[in-house]
């Protein structure tokens, strides 16, 4: 069984731990977080406002360990990823979920002994051997030379498979997409200056992002195209993206239009989608039910294609809507690629 260590025990780190309680594919033996309150970490693992309480799993603290159903997870409190004794813990794969660039820069230094791979849960501009997305560019992955791997971002994981399929089957000449993304912890509850927006490593320019996150749709720049380029280099010349932060807590959506090179029909698009879901199970899901965003809470797919809004206009303009759980769905993508990288 593959052994995992998690650096950064925030939303993604805890989601990965909960997902493993469901699937039981790996052993999580170590987590590292700069917050020294181990009881608080255990509390947040057990009680989650978004995903609910762990009702059938026993979570307790014993010294420097969190015990989940009797299985121990040792908790470290190091500020840098290189200071954690991953090798001593027998870790095969370290998941870098802190979001701190310095940890990405140090990732190659911990590839030794038992540690074979580091997965970075965002899309940094440096320190990465390969940006991996199953069903998109996974056939280009080289196990012998790619050791520090980016799992990209939630938005790119949602759009990437759909874009790849449509571009392969019909050709995408140009695309306009808008992401609708729930608020994040660095945003303000009440109006404030940009300096009050707590997001280390980011320099925001638009005053609108300092406004209250719970009362309005907030237009915002997005890193989607930059992240897509790292996985699909040619996509940068075809796609333009914008974003809204929405006054909701979970589940994102992408509303988009592709101008196609090849004329097609809705039946041909639907068939291509069905074939893709069979070739790459678990990546895209097709759904024609009358659902709303919260109904996709806890969905593990990279994205759900809402067939109600899939439309071909005059043969070459494809309208689409995708849904994705920006926390659980993305964490599930990270979780399931671990075994594909070893």
Regions found by a protein language model. Name each.
Residues 34-36, 124-125, 153-155, 179-187, ...:
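Glycine-rich beta-alpha junction loops
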Residues 205, 211-220, 285:
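Small/polar-rich, solvent-exposed N-terminal microdomains that initiate assembly or binding
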Residues 205-209, 249-254:
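Short acidic (Asp/Glu) and glycine-rich catalytic loops that position anionic groups and cofactors
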Residues 1-210, 336:
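N-terminal Rossmann-like NAD(P) cofactor-binding subdomain of oxidoreductases
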Residues 23-25, 169, 232, 280, ...:
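Acidic-histidine catalytic/liganding microenvironments
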Residues 230-244:
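A structural supersecondary motif
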Residues 7, 11, 89, 105, ...:
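Conserved active-site and cofactor/substrate-binding residues in soluble primary-metabolism enzymes
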Residues 240-246, 253-342:
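C-terminal active-site/capping subdomain that shapes the small-molecule cofactor and substrate pocket
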């Amino acid at each position: 069984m593959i052994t995992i260590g998690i650096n950064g025990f925030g939303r993604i780190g805890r989601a990965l731990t909960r997902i493993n309680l469901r699937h039981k594919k790996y052993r999580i033996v170590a987590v590292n977080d700069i917050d020294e309150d181990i009881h608080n970490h255990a509390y947040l693992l057990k009680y989650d406002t978004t995903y609910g309480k762990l009702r059938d799993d026993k979570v307790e603290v014993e010294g420097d360990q969190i015990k989940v159903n009797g299985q121990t997870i040792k908790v470290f409190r190091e500020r840098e990823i290189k200071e954690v004794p991953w090798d001593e813990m027998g870790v095969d794969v370290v998941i870098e979920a802190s979001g701190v660039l310095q940890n990405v820069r140090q990732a190659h230094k911990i590839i030794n002994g038992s540690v074979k791979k580091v997965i970075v849960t965002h899309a940094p501009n440096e320190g990465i051997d390969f940006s991996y997305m199953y069903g998109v560019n996974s056939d280009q992955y080289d196990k012998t030379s790619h050791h520090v791997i980016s799992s990209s971002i939630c938005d790119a994981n949602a759009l990437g498979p759909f874009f790849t399929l449509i571009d392969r089957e019909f050709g995408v000449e140009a695309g306009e997409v808008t992401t609708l993304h729930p608020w994040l912890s660095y945003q303000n509850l009440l109006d404030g200056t940009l300096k009050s927006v707590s997001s280390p490593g980011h320099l925001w320019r638009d005053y609108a992002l300092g406004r209250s996150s719970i009362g309005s749709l907030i237009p915002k720049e997005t890193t989607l195209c930059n992240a897509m380029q790292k996985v699909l280099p040619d996509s940068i010349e075809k796609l333009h993206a914008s974003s809204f932060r929405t006054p909701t807590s979970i589940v994102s959506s992408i509303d988009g239009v592709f101008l196609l090179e090849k004329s097609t029909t809705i039946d041909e698009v639907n068939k291509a989608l069905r074939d893709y879901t069979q070739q790459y199970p678990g990546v895209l899901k097709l759904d024609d039910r009358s659902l709303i965003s919260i109904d996709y809470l806890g969905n593990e797919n990279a994205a759900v294609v809402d067939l109600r809004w899939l439309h071909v206009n005059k043969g070459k303009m494809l309208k689409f809507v995708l849904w994705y759980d920006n926390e659980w769905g993305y964490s599930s993508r990270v979780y399931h690629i671990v075994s594909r990288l070893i």
